Amino acid sequence: MIRRVSTTSCLSATAFRSFTKWSFKSSQFHGESLDSSVSPLLIPGFHVFHCPDVVGIVAKLSDCIAAKGGNILGYDVFVPENKNVFYSRSEFIFDPVKWPRRQMDEDFQTIAQKFSALSSVVRVPSLDPKYKIALLLSKQDHCLVEMLHKWQDGKLPVDITCVISNHERAPNTHVMRFLQRHGISYHYLPTTDQNKIEEEILELVKGTDFLVLARYMQLLSGNFLKGYGKDVINIHHGLLPSFKGRNPVKQAFDAGVKLIGATTHFVTEELDSGPIIEQMVERVSHRDNLRSFVQKSEDLEKKCLMKAIKSYCELRVLPYGTQRTVVF
């Protein structure tokens, strides 16, 4: 159980440390994403922390932010039962003049060393470069179109470096015109069972921070994943761990399910088995046919993928063991 407490000012850390799992949100923000319009002088930042669990972690982190004039607006903590591990994510506002960006990194790094942290990441969206991503897809492009439109509207906090596909697209299509208009390169790399063109893909995605498989119907090899060395996020048109592999919508339809779903997960060497980031479902019935299953699935896929990417960029997603995630 997570204990949720409301506060309007900086943490009183010692009062909360007795809870093993708790979080709080400033009532002023109602749990929404932080906005730099709060003050012309204050800007938002995020910090995630993962370390062995000991007394005093929350106090040290909150004191660090308060000492620099920052104000914590949201703090989430997760401590699994019977495991000596601690996860946290804080949202705060601060004055970058009083707390320079480089100094912030140094301050949190000092705490990370003190607690032998496995991970300590800080992000200030208005000061840090946007995450650079590449998109991979096959024939179906509904997820790509959704991402491009959200990106154009400023609702996807990334820079799209390129789009890679194993299907050729005519130059006069909506997707190709959009990419050309925004200066995003499109690379057609046909694949076969014997040649997945992975070396060429690796060359194109150099310099990206993570990859998004927006319905890319090819299995990436272990060598590719090791060569890339960063996160790869996939949207699967089924509710994992059920209905893995090809045509999961048809599998679900034939099974007579009453809930259809979509799953966003990290890619691993095993097909459709990586840690799950986000899942969404919608009810179906005996009145649905395969065509309506597909339409509902595509709507879910777009929403599920967008939410997962947004959560990832806001440092809400942390690995938990080998097969699970913590999503704050």
Curated annotation (Swiss-Prot):
Its main location: mitochondrion. The keyword Manganese does not apply. NCBIfam families: PRK06027.1. The active site is at residue 272. Expressed in leaves, cotyledons, roots, seeds and flowers. GO terms for biological process: 'de novo' IMP biosynthetic process; one-carbon metabolic process; photorespiration; tetrahydrofolate metabolic process. PROSITE patterns: ACT, GART. It comes from the Eukaryota. It is an enzyme of class 3 (hydrolase). Disruption phenotype: No visible phenotype. Puru1 and puru2 double mutant shows a 70-fold increase in Gly levels and accumulates elevated levels of 5- and 10-formyl THF. Embryo development arrests between heart and early bent cotyledon stages, and mature seeds are shriveled, accumulate low amounts of lipids, and fail to germinate. Puru1 and puru2 double mutant is only conditionally lethal and is rescued by growth under nonphotorespiratory conditions. Puru1, puru2 and fold1 triple mutant shows no photorespiratory phenotype. It catalyses: (6R)-10-formyltetrahydrofolate + H2O = (6S)-5,6,7,8-tetrahydrofolate + formate + H(+). This is Formyltetrahydrofolate deformylase 2, mitochondrial. The keyword Chaperone does not apply. Residues 46-129 form the ACT domain. Belongs to the PurU family. It comes from Arabidopsis thaliana. Its EC number is 3.5.1.10. Deformylase involved in photorespiration. Prevents excessive accumulation of 5-formyl tetrahydrofolate (THF), a potent inhibitor of the Gly decarboxylase/Ser hydroxymethyltransferase complex. GO terms for cellular component: mitochondrion.
